[in-house]
């Protein structure tokens, strides 16, 4: 038996994010579905006021986890152009696709051919025309420089060492003046022996050394352990 929705309202802080309230008092966040009737990762579809919303699962998306943990700044709105490094099978990119809408664009880089095929099936083949799929290695931005034009945001979520360096290298290529970067730090992918807080500090220092001002840092527990989201802006 499904629980009835009693209200859907815009998030008080974040453009394109909605808060769904259910009759049992629980709340979830969601985005307005750019491709109504279609799911990406088995998420719940919610109809309200003539629109359809996709529930945004914080256990499947680091950005959703950061928002629920109080992230104040998400530099993504309608029409934003984004370079997304580590697109995987498309969970978070699909919600960003909803937010940026038809006038936005997401250049989505994924290294694994198998996962890339899954990304294509779930997003591109399902009609998300604001997604540009790129099979490539985020460590070498020159390999896809001919595909990507200047972007407003570079977002990275990769399970590799030197995550901040990879982000900064891509920002040097593609980030417009005044643009933002969003770094998901996966501490265990960098150093399994060091405390996560030390790894976070190390990656943040790398961004500072590369000319970024750190605007906000949010830890992602309980949704993901030893993870943090960092928002920064190029000086």
From Swiss-Prot:
Which keywords belong to this entry?
Methyltransferase, RNA-binding, rRNA processing, Transferase, tRNA processing
Q: Name one GO biological process term.
A: rRNA methylation
The GO molecular function terms of this record are: histone H2AQ104 methyltransferase activity; RNA binding; rRNA methyltransferase activity
One Pfam family from the record? Fibrillarin
Record EC number: 2.1.1.-
In terms of superkingdom, the source organism counts as Archaea
* Binding sites annotated in the UniProt record for S-adenosyl-L-methionine: 91-92, 110-111, 137-138, 157-160
> What is the protein's known function?
Involved in pre-rRNA and tRNA processing. Utilizes the methyl donor S-adenosyl-L-methionine to catalyze the site-specific 2'-hydroxyl methylation of ribose moieties in rRNA and tRNA. Site specificity is provided by a guide RNA that base pairs with the substrate. Methylation occurs at a characteristic distance from the sequence involved in base pairing with the guide RNA.
Family label: Belongs to the methyltransferase superfamily. Fibrillarin family.
Q: How does it assemble?
A: Interacts with nop5. Component of box C/D small ribonucleoprotein (sRNP) particles that contain rpl7ae, FlpA and nop5, plus a guide RNA.
Name assigned to this protein: Fibrillarin-like rRNA/tRNA 2'-O-methyltransferase
Q: Which organism is it from?
A: Pyrobaculum aerophilum (strain ATCC 51768 / DSM 7523 / JCM 9630 / CIP 104966 / NBRC 100827 / IM2)
């Amino acid at each position: 038996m499904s629980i009835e929705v009693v209200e859907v309202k815009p998030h008080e802080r974040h453009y394109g994010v909605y808060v769904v309230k259910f009759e049992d008092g629980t709340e979830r966040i969601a985005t307005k579905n750019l491709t109504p009737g279609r799911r990406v990762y088995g998420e719940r579809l919610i109809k309200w006021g003539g629109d359809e919303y996709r529930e945004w699962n914080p256990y499947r998306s680091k950005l959703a986890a950061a928002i629920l943990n109080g992230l104040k700044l998400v530099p993504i709105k309608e029409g934003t152009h984004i370079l997304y490094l580590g697109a995987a099978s498309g969970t978070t990119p699909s919600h960003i696709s909803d937010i940026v809408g038809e006038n936005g664009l997401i250049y989505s880089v994924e290294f694994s051919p198998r996962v890339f095929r899954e990304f294509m099936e779930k997003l591109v083949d399902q009609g998300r025309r604001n997604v540009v799929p790129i099979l490539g290695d985020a460590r070498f931005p020159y390999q896809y420089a001919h595909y990507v034009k200047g972007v407003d945001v570079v977002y990275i979520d990769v399970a590799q060492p030197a995550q901040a360096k990879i982000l900064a290298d891509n920002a040097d290529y593609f980030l417009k003046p005044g643009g933002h970067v969003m770094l998901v730090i996966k501490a265990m992918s960098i150093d399994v022996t060091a405390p996560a807080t030390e790894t976070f500090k190390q990656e943040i220092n790398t961004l500072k050394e590369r000319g970024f001002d750190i605007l906000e840092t949010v830890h992602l527990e309980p949704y993901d352990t030893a993870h943090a989201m960092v928002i920064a802006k190029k000086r």
